[in-house]
């Protein structure tokens, strides 16, 4: 068999530039940043003439450190890894080499020297390079965990809980590094973690107990500085109580959308997707993620607000007039069941990432690419749950069902928002939320 000494430069360059070209070739989204709806219909919550749209937020401050860079070495040659490819972290060159070898069924002249594969010499011995790819576990089937043989699956899961001194498993190490990266991004971008919220709700936190809001009087005490630093911008101090609470919810939602956008930009490969696809994933995913995270600050009696400074009772929210009283109750019901799964923040980080990178969202341009990213996240989530909850045998399928439950919850919520927009003529929706709800379901 012929033993090629060098990869063709033009082929190699094509492979290495492939993903970059895809990102740079992303089309404008319906006219670019001007796509955000005008704020003239919403003066209570935003005095800005042009509040940031989802596209604007995606394009803000995105650099290599904040946009999903793992800063990991390629397992094959030691070059900088561009992502998780065929089951291991690999650079663009080794990813392309492995793909070409498999697709074209190339056979290389056998080498007995066990050549050391490094960035500077990786093209010298293709046989040893391919053998190293195989030894590290690179495989077309590695994209989807479900296609792996059961024996291999059990071996990988066992590796998660193995002692530090045990035999090194590159696939497990890559998934651990991936999970850690997602968890660190979660801690960096979200002000309220579940750990912090539960310590406040159970009275174990060191700071002052939250101020309890249970009626109109305590709400206005909270607004005067006990909980919130300032009133909602432009909101008259004695506007109808139900509308005021609705506006407060919108303020919190908009801030959480901003946090989720930054978190999404930290997920490996998210920022290399078409901008149109990034916007679509956020449009359909943020509310599912918000309602999943809402469970962290909820117990059966109420929920934390203002970063834990206040606690609004469930009964007070039920006392609001319809349709506003109907908004939060289904979220309480979901939260109580979701909290029974006893997830921690490291579990939630991967779960939220899997929600955002969902390949069946309407209007996606590159479905296979999104599905491949989500497959990696789900694989990492399943491994992580096996290690973090060894006695919870069915936790992973239960979480997949919760993803379906969240989709139904958001569908009903979006429909409710559209009804409020039509029937409550004195009530406005924030422009960013209008953009999200428009033509949603």
Swiss-Prot record:
The stretches annotated as zinc fingers (NR C4-type) lie at 74-94, 111-133
Q: Which residues bind DNA?
A: 71-145
Record's PROSITE patterns?
NR_LBD, NUCLEAR_REC_DBD_1, NUCLEAR_REC_DBD_2
Q: Name one Pfam family in it.
A: Hormone_recep
Q: Where is this region: Disordered?
A: 1-54
Question: Where can this protein be found?
Answer: Nucleus
Q: How is it modified after translation?
A: 'Lys-48'-linked polyubiquitinated; leading to proteasomal degradation. Deubiquitinated and stabilized by OTUD3.
Keywords linked to the UniProt accession: Activator, DNA-binding, Metal-binding, Nucleus, Receptor, Transcription, Transcription regulation, Ubl conjugation, Zinc, Zinc-finger
Cited SMART domains? HOLI, ZnF_C4
Q: In this entry, which stretches build a coiled coil?
A: none
**What is the purpose of this protein?**
Ligand-activated transcription factor key mediator of energy metabolism in adipose tissues. Receptor that binds peroxisome proliferators such as hypolipidemic drugs and fatty acids. Has a preference for poly-unsaturated fatty acids, such as gamma-linoleic acid and eicosapentanoic acid. Once activated by a ligand, the receptor binds to promoter elements of target genes. Regulates the peroxisomal beta-oxidation pathway of fatty acids. Functions as transcription activator for the acyl-CoA oxidase gene. Decreases expression of NPC1L1 once activated by a ligand.
The name this protein carries in UniProt is Peroxisome proliferator-activated receptor delta
Task: Please report the organism this UniProt entry assigns to the protein.
Answer: Homo sapiens (Human)
């Amino acid at each position: 068999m012929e033993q090629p000494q060098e990869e063709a430069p033009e082929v190699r360059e094509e492979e290495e530039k492939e993903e970059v070209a895809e990102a740079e070739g992303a089309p404008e989204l319906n006219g670019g940043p001007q796509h955000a709806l005008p704020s003239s219909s919403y003066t209570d919550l935003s005095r800005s003439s042009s509040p940031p749209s989802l596209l604007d937020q995606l394009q803000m401050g995105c650099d290599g450190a904040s946009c999903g860079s793992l800063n990991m070495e390629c397992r094959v040659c030691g070059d900088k890894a561009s992502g998780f490819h065929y089951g291991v972290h690999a650079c663009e060159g080794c990813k392309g080499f492995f793909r070409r070898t498999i697709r074209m069924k190339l056979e290389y002249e056998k080498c007995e020297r066990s050549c050391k594969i490094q960035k500077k010499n990786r093209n010298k011995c293709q046989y040893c390079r391919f053998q190293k790819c195989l030894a590290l576990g690179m495989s077309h089937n590695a994209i989807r965990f479900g296609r792996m043989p059961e024996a291999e699956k059990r071996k990988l899961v066992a590796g998660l809980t193995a002692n530090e001194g045990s035999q090194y498993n590159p696939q497990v190490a890559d998934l651990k590094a991936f999970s850690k990266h997602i968890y660190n991004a979660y801690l960096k971008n979200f002000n309220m973690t579940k750990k912090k919220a539960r310590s406040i709700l159970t009275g174990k936190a060191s700071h002052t107990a939250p101020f309890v809001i249970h009626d109109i009087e305590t709400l206005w005490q909270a607004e005067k500085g006990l909980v919130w630093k300032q009133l909602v911008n432009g909101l008259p101090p004695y506007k109808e109580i139900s509308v005021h609470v609705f506006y407060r919810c919108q303020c919190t939602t908009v801030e959480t959308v901003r946090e989720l956008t930054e978190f999404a930009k930290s997920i490996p490969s998210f920022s290399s997707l078409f901008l149109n696809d990034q916007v679509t994933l956020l449009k359909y995913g943020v509310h599912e993620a918000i309602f999943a995270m809402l469970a962290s600050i909820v117990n059966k009696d109420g929920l934390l607000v203002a970063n834990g400074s206040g606690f609004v009772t469930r009964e007070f929210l039920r006392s609001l007039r319809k349709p506003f009283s109907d908004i939060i109750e289904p979220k309480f019901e979901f939260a109580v069941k979701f909290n029974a799964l006893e997830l921690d923040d490291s579990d939630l980080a991967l779960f939220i990432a899997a929600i955002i990178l969902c390949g069946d969202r309407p209007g996606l341009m590159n479905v296979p690419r999104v599905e491949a990213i989500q497959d990696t996240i789900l694989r990492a989530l399943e491994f992580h749950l096996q290690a973090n909850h060894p006695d919870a045998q069915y936790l992973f399928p239960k979480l997949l069902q919760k993803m379906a439950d969240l989709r139904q919850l958001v569908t009903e919520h979006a429909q409710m928002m559209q009804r409020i927009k039509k029937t409550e003529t004195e009530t406005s929706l924030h422009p960013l939320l209008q953009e999200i709800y428009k033509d949603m379901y």
